[in-house]
From Swiss-Prot:
Full protein name: Phosphate import ATP-binding protein PstB
Primary gene name: pstB
GO MF annotations, alphabetized: ATP binding; ATP hydrolysis activity; ATPase-coupled phosphate ion transmembrane transporter activity
Domain ABC transporter: 23-264
UniProt KW Nucleotide-binding keyword: yes
Family the UniProt entry places it in: Belongs to the ABC transporter superfamily. Phosphate importer (TC 3.A.1.7) family.
Record GO biological process: phosphate ion transmembrane transport
Organism expressing this protein natively: Xylella fastidiosa (strain Temecula1 / ATCC 700964)
GO cellular component: plasma membrane
Length: 269
């Protein structure tokens, strides 16, 4: 039986060579103690596009994603080597402020993690840690973030209710609102729909399409159909190596590496 390829629906029209680069890694390696999780990663992520990272479990996708906002700095014995440039500046440099980085690079995790406080305070929380503004300005920022996350119409009359009362899909969109409230330029999404039902997943995917007009988005997903639907570019990773990175249409229809071909056609992984 011939192997069925995944239909491509994402709009990946711009070649890598003409799209401005937002994030670039140079000879990037990462270590969990003595274990090397990433090996000489050289990757350019285009601005205001969606880049998907695919590959089997344990290949380094989430590790790479978390380097982009240095979340590993919270834990001892974890070390990144090499360079990661955001808008031309090396974010791995000790001179690059963590607070500055976190305001420019937002992150949404696999499981929705709303704070045990009101919907309003969930969105306002991060803003208060980075900026000082009056009540009316804060109200505007909270509304803007909820509008961008396609949640405003559902919660505008219950902003003072506990966020834990929202559905799973609403909670994940709230987490996206919390991330965009800081007006970052990059959004990192680590399997943002894996814990959601199909309807909520569809809402998040539609939202990603809307958000990429303002943000550079990097998404980790185990769902190759999702990668094909939402991304403009795709990187395939295996055992800590970046095997191939190209336009999504190219990756799924005519990959240049046999390992990529084998993975997307289900021969391994």
């Amino acid at each position: 039986m011939p192997i069925q390829r995944i239909a491509i629906t994402a709009s990946a029209n711009a070649p890598l060579t003409t799209t401005p680069v937002k994030i670039a890694t140079r000879n990037l390696e990462f270590y969990y103690g003595t274990f090397q999780a990433l090996k000489q990663i050289n990757l350019e992520i285009p601005e205001k596009r969606v880049t998907a990272l695919i590959g089997p479990s344990g290949c380094g996708k989430s590790t790479l994603l978390r380097i982009f906002n240095r979340i590993y700095a919270l834990y001892p014995k974890l070390e990144a080597r090499g360079e990661v440039f955001l808008d031309g500046e090396n974010i791995l440099s000790p001179k690059y402020s963590i607070n500055r980085l976190r305001s420019k690079v937002g992150m949404v995790f696999q499981k929705p993690v709303p704070f045990p406080m009101t919907i309003y305070e969930n969105v306002a929380y991060g803003i208060r840690h980075h900026e000082v503004m009056c009540k009316s300005q804060m109200n505007d920022r909270v509304e803007q973030a909820l509008q961008q996350s396609a949640l405003w119409e559902e919660v505008k009359d219950k902003l003072n209710q506990n966020a834990l009362g929202l559905s799973g899909g609403q909670q994940q969109r709230l987490c996206i609102a919390r991330a965009v409230a800081l007006t970052p330029s990059v959004l990192l999404l680590d399997e943002p729909t894996s814990a959601l039902d199909p309807i909520s997943t569809s809402r998040i995917e539609q939202l990603i399409e809307e958000l990429k007009t303002k943000y550079t988005i990097v998404i980790v997903t185990h769902n190759m159909q999702q990668a094909a639907r939402v991304s403009d570019y795709t990187g395939f990773m295996y055992l800590g190596d970046l095997i191939e990175h190209d336009r999504t249409e190219t990756i799924f229809s005519r990959p240049s590496k046999q390992q990529t071909e084998d993975y997307i056609t289900g021969r391994f992984g």
